[in-house]
């Protein structure tokens, strides 16, 4: 295993926002995502809430990023992570990591998810904290061989699956306990009424 900088194994690109006062730039067919659309339950994002037009792309000189790109919110808030399921555009609240052949995007996804506090500590700015492209490029990651990355991701996926299953089971148990208590209350009220 070797330690490398993200900038050595990923191309890091930022997004841009087309002018919001140009209606011909909006409500098109192209995905344009913002950090507000990401949450902890999302691994792969396939659609954005807002869409832009081809005219917006041309006039604003927007750069798309391909499916498989790791999206990292770089401000407001720092540290939301997802993987693009298809080609997308985004606002400037992201630093997008286009993975080289040396790094598996889901391995990078899990790495970044585990480093939210660290990423926030790297934030700079008075009004709101932001991490720059240079900061992201210089983040170091332990990088095993790609085959090992796949194994690690497989194990992490299984752990997440088990946690999700246990959470569902706990929710059902909680509902059962609540319904049992409600049933007891109903029975005791009926006994009083009789």
Listing of model-derived features with the role each one plays in the protein:
Residues 1-16, 138-146, 150-153, 165-194:
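Non-catalytic DNA-recognition/assembly elements of restriction-modification systems
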Residues 1-41, 56-60, 189-194:
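Low-complexity, Lys/Gly-biased intrinsically disordered segments
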Residues 7, 11, 31-34, 95, ...:
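Generic alpha-helical structural context detector
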